[in-house]
Amino acid sequence: MREGMFIKKNVDKWNEYQHNPTSDPDETAERFITLVDDLSYAKTFYPRSKVTRWINSIASAIYLSIYKNKKEKYSRVFTFWKYEVPLLFKKYHRLLLFTFLLFSLFVGIGVFSSIKDESFIRGILGDSYVDMTEDNISKGDPFGVYKSDNPFTNFVYIAMNNSFVALLMVIGGVLIGIGTIWAMWNNGLMLGCFQYIFFAKGLGFQSILVIWVHGTLEILSLVIASTAGLVITQGILFPGTYSRLVSFKRGIKDAMKIMIVLVPVFIIASFFENYVTYLMGNTFDKQSSGGLPVWAGILILTLSLSFIIWYFVIYPIQLHKEGYHIQKNGAIKLTVKPI
């Protein structure tokens, strides 16, 4: 085929490929294969022609776009954890503070009610649980509740259960926050009552070292899950410039991102509860010789608290000050401030 005829037959197609790129991966692959065929033909019969260089440039551009998209699939995970999630929390910092204060209030009510009437504890935690705990304390093994014959099975169960409870807290936001706040109320009262039992028995310091080795991640993650639920509620009640439906969908999307982040945190907390808390419990068990040093418990507790405060509070503020922000389309953008 003469070069002129070859160009006339394919020029419209090449122009289309060059000036109207497609986002459809199947279409992109088909275009690339077609161009490779055309390029092979051109190199065979018109090796020094300008049209050969033109086809090569179009094919190269498509190849680079395929490579870039493949690379972005991996960088997307990195961007999600390093920028998207922290900036998302910067957006909801006031809501996070409100949720934390509200949950703390519920815990305080649990403690105060227990001080005024110890029968309140049994009404919240149940007679069997309170009797078991008091029996363990009398036997010199106050934290025997954390001992398990099959720690791995317990680890899996607790991780799944905590994730499920957190998901219910998130979904509760759909009910104008009633479900979320009700879950916070129940968990706050239980925590306040449970913690008071040990303080009332003179085991306050020991209970902090044992319970909060895993509880720091677990409880604060439940607070964050409650925040995610209230994000949905906020989207329903305060749509701003968006329609209520669009605002609701955006709230759901943000809440699910938060939930994704919490799953690995719950897994770590469950690991701590079944292996580290167990060892800390042995530290204060009069009949056990194997336990974890007190300094190790303090270190784990401190690192857990530091991680939550840094990743969900301090780091988002730092990113915001550096000029990073989330655009309406969800993209991360760095705005360089003029000197």
Predicted regions: what is each one?
Residues 1-81:
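Soluble N-terminal domains of membrane-associated systems
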Residues 56, 107, 111-136:
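Interfacial/capping segments of alpha-helical transmembrane domains
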Residues 71, 76-93, 144-145, 149, ...:
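Cytosolic juxtamembrane amphipathic/interface segments immediately preceding
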Residues 87-105:
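Alpha-helical transmembrane segments and their helix-start/interface "positive-inside/aromatic belt" motifs
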Residues 106-110, 165-168, 173, 180-203:
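Small-polar-interrupted transmembrane alpha-helices in polytopic inner-membrane proteins
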Residues 123-168, 191, 199-201, 206:
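Interfacial loop/helix-cap signal at membrane boundaries in integral membrane proteins
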Residues 195-302:
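Hydrophobic alpha-helical transmembrane segments and adjacent short intramembrane/lumenal linkers
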Residues 320-339:
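Short, highly charged, low-complexity non-transmembrane loops/tails of multi-pass membrane proteins
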